[in-house]
């Protein structure tokens, strides 16, 4: 969608949803469960130090995924869309997993409170005016993208194949 053609506060014409809010939450949490397993597949030192081709370490990517999802969840629930502030990256794997788990619980409790009509309302997202559903889909897409990077990192470390702890990408 061309953000110049959409104004904040506009609601798109009602069309039947492809996913219900409950299905969206289940889909999103399925991705999050798989990404959590991938975070755990890294050793502590590799999580925050190892990267390929100038990309960021997976610990930094994990924090970005957590921060983006937390920001979008807060926006969806509160219906306020300020410029994001990401906060400090957790310094250890256990801290990242704890923040991840706290956010998972928040999503389970708070996402069902978002009125379904809000998803079709155009909101002033920090990358341009878009329907609110685009924000949720962005968080999911961003996670899939970064999780793919994590798989590349683990494979380049030789952590792939039968008997290793790398979860298959289809097990969400």
Question: Can you describe what each PLM-predicted range is?
Answer:
Residues 2-13, 25-39, 44-86, 124-172:
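Short, contiguous alpha-helical
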Residues 14-22:
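Short, low-complexity N-terminal intrinsically disordered segments enriched in polar/charged residues
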Residues 20, 27-31, 99, 103:
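Soluble or luminal CAZymes and related metallo-dependent hydrolases
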Residues 74-114:
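Helix-adjacent hinge/juxtasegments
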Residues 111-126:
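Acidic catalytic patch
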């Amino acid at each position: 969608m061309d953000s110049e053609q959409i104004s904040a506060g506009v609601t798109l014409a009602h069309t039947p949803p492809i996913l219900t809010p409950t299905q969206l939450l289940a889909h999103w949490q399925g991705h999050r469960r798989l990404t959590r397993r991938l975070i755990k597949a890294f050793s502590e030192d590799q999580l925050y130090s190892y990267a390929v081709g100038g990309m960021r370490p997976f610990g930094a990517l994990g924090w970005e995924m957590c921060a983006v999802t937390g920001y979008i969840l807060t926006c969806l629930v509160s219906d306020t869309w300020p410029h994001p502030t990401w906060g400090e990256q957790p310094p250890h794997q256990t801290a990242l997993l704890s923040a991840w788990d706290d956010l998972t619980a928040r999503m389970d409790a708070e996402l069902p409170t978002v009125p379904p009509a809000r998803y079709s309302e155009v909101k002033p997202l920090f990358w341009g005016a878009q329907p609110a559903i685009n924000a949720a889909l962005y968080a999911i897409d961003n996670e899939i993208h970064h999780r793919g990077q994590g798989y590349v990192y683990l494979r380049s470390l030789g952590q792939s194949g039968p008997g290793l702890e790398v979860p298959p990408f289809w097990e969400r």
